Amino acid sequence: HLKRPCKFSCPVDAITYDEHGISVIDKNKCIRCGKCIHSCPFGAIASKTFIVPVINALREGKHIYAMAAPATEGQFGADITMESWRKAMKELGFVDFYDVGLGGDMTAAYEAEEWAEAYKEGQKKVTSCCPAFVNMVRLHYPQLADNISTTVSPMCAISRMIKAQDPEAITVFIGPCLAKKSEVVDQQIEGNADYVLTYSEIRAIMKAKDVELEACPNDNQTASTFGKRFANSGGVTAAVLESLKESDNCIDAKVCRANGSQECKKA
């Protein structure tokens, strides 16, 4: 068989062919990173969508909250701010809107404490915010699974905060990362987001309701620069190191940064 784009793109060799030449994904190897979906020129692979349950919750008037990844800011133009998104989401029927960058600040603070404790005990730690990376460690490097940080992701941190304030809350994460769907479906972390929507999915709902993103002043800033840069390569590390500086935990932490799955494998 010719090597197809999906198989070529897979960082963990999770795609094979059956006797009919049809591509098969090995669920015991797949890390849910979504690279095969983006690489397939035929659109033959798709991620699970939560559009229907989100629409139903909105139509039923449930306490549903939107939480957007920091990458959302500026994703649709320099004039489209988090305040633009807040107004649009409320127009759709969401109770409120939160910047998950604030969850990045929360995560950095807790993870800094965890790093400091591990440093004192001579242990190594790997971050837990990227579900594709966590899946890679658990499935392909199980001997390192105990080194994964127990601190929840920024998405989960904000979701827990919302649910602590409103026990009836349903939380929806909006962002560019398909792997976040795996965090919700596979990891089953208490208090985490109930649903995940990609930008194309939330835009589909907005189009159906004739809701547009409008330019607004950038005055809805609840997160620090470090919290907003979590998705950058080394962003989590930078935020945690900054939290360590601001605390009494002064340690000489040696860090290893990796950009993408291939670098993670080498690290």
Regions found by a protein language model. Name each.
Residues 48-267:
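Iron-sulfur-associated redox domains of electron-transfer enzymes in respiratory
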Residues 1-31, 35-51:
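Iron-sulfur cluster-binding cysteine motifs and their immediate structural context
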